[in-house]
Amino acid sequence: MLFSFQRALSCLVLGGALLLSLPTQAFCFNEAGARYKVDPLLLRSMATVESSLNPQAIGKNRDKKGRITSRDFGLMQINDRHIPELRALGILSNEQDLLNNPCLNVQIGAWILAKHLKQCGVNWQCLGSYNAGFADNNGPRRMIYARKVYAMYMKLKGGAV
């Protein structure tokens, strides 16, 4: 009986923490969108596809032999290849900053996306480069990612989520 009460209390506390974080998350997406001139709902859609809105998410990218080639961090799954530049700019000290500060993570994701859109234009292939990169042979992967983001965008826009 005590165990189930503790479990129920834990669920309520966790649920409350998640509810409290939703307005904060909305603020982060709105702020980043305004700063980098990107639709905040698009950023939220990308974060949902990238991490299921989990600020502690860590993704491991592997080669064909299963070796880890890079890691992605936080809501926007910022790839570790960006860390040296972000350190040099004084934006973060290490990858833990990407996990501990979700708003910073969203700002960095919006910055990366804005750089991509400036480089290759405002189109779905270019949006897909956020996840799949610019390599010529990654065109199909870019479009798969873009379709996922578009589907999530339409779902969020319709209020279904």
What are these regions (language model features)?
Residues M1-L12:
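Bacterial N-terminal signal peptides that target proteins for export
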